[in-house]
């Protein structure tokens, strides 16, 4: 069993890590899942992060992220991807990360969210991706 002290130390380390990244304006690659929601919840103690989600029109993921962002009372932008955009960005990402098609596929929404963050003047980006 994990002690309360260990849980508190982990929570403190997590908070410190997010605080150290939240110098100035930040964006969070936001799915509305537990990892990105935890980051957003802590980040809002130090800044007003912009939550950004990418997906296709009508996606339940976009809707879930939008609802969770509203519950957190944080600004949220949805990046709606068309089939043509997905193919175009996939080709760009493939040039960056040849060979591992799954990683290239996962890069597409990240690429589009990072572009949106840059357009919004956010140069620090947090992500819960891979937290597990």
What are these regions (language model features)?
Residues 2-132:
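ATP-dependent adenylate-handling active sites, centered on carboxylate activation for C-N bond formation
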